[in-house]
């Protein structure tokens, strides 16, 4: 699965500080790009980097309930040097 680069638009929780009007609170729309390294019925997990042994670093788990759209990202692979 780690050969699939994706763009994910998703909604994150947001909080406010101090006193304010009730309608001042809003959600944050986030845009993330990474390698899809794991998925379940509840989450998608993307990573910034994939190692030679198919391990990964800097993983982000995004709840599917928060995801607005997922798009594949074309990646041009270069030959080994």
Model-derived regions, located:
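Conserved RNA-binding domains used in RNP assembly and mRNA/RNA metabolism
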Residues: 1-81
């Amino acid at each position: 699965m780690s050969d699939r680069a994706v763009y994910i638009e998703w909604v994150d929780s947001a909080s406010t500080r101090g006193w304010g009007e009730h309608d001042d609170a809003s959600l944050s729309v986030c845009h993330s790009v990474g390698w899809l390294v794991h998925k379940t019925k509840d989450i998608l997990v993307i990573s910034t980097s994939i190692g030679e042994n198919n391990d990964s670093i800097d993983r982000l788990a995004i709840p599917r309930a928060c995801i607005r759209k997922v798009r594949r990202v074309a990646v041009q692979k270069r030959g080994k040097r």
